[in-house]
Amino acid sequence: MKNIGQMLKQAQQLQTRMAEVQEELKAMDVSGQSAAGMCVVTLDGKGGVRSIKIDPSLVDPKETEVMEDLIVAAFNDAKAKVDEMVKEKMSELTGGLKLPPGMSLPF
């Protein structure tokens, strides 16, 4: 029974720490950019878009399609960085916890 109590305590600690990490991630800013930095997208640590900056030289009606492509590229760059950051944080958090194969945390 001591083992079960210890496991429950560890699970509670993990749950508390996960909530803390979620708040830390939400407070972080991660920016991604397209080629030459003409478009920069900044996400929070959970993947929400905080801002989009567009080089003024692109604000030409003829450049709409180019601008859209650059925004997509910048967003994808920032999202990949966020995903990697979340993976690293969760790895730190679960370092001592052995999860069953195929099981992952809710991130």
UniProtKB/Swiss-Prot annotation:
One of its GO terms (cellular component) is bacterial nucleoid. It comes from the Bacteria. Pfam families: YbaB_DNA_bd (PF02575). NCBIfam families: DNA_YbaB_EbfC. Belongs to the YbaB/EbfC family. Signal peptide: none annotated. This is Nucleoid-associated protein Rru_A3472. It is found in: Cytoplasm, Nucleoid. Keywords: Cytoplasm, DNA-binding. GO terms for molecular function: DNA binding. Homodimer. It comes from Rhodospirillum rubrum (strain ATCC 11170 / ATH 1.1.1 / DSM 467 / LMG 4362 / NCIMB 8255 / S1). Binds to DNA and alters its conformation. May be involved in regulation of gene expression, nucleoid organization and DNA protection. HAMAP family: DNA_YbaB_EbfC.
